[in-house]
Amino acid sequence: MSYASDQPIIKEFRSGRFTMIPLAEYKISGVMVSKKTYSSNWDGKVSPIDLAIAWGKLAEPENDRYITYSQGYRWYHYKWREGSPVDHSYVISHSSNNHIIPANENIYRAIKTIKTKDRVVLKGLLVNLKGTYKGQTVTWNTSLSRTDTGNGSCELFYVTYVRIETKIYE
């Protein structure tokens, strides 16, 4: 996961300016298990959608009856029932919460159409963000690990490519 350019990506809004520093190229494929939209505050302007994506056994329909997924203010939650063929460590290593920063309007529109259990492929960059919003300094950093948990373990994902089932958006 390396990125050949140190060129920052700038996003400007009426009340803020944000600089994203690319850290790594990133690709994730799986099924979307939960989606949450945001519109208020500075983070909702930059990253209007969070997608929880799962792969491996978690993407198999026969396991849906054992696991439920949800999201709340930038956090991803799951519960599994007794008899589940997967355990806590498997869920952690086979799912992720992605804070989506659409590269353009077409990507944003595509992300909004993703439905639960859609098979998706997303490509782009993991970024750290710094900026100002309404005169306040803000920062937001991505995770670069697939094994971390808790606060700071989500991917801050600048998305440049979306495939939903067989449809491609760039």
Task: Please state what every model-predicted region is.
Residues 1-170:
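OB-fold and OB-like single-stranded nucleic-acid-recognition modules
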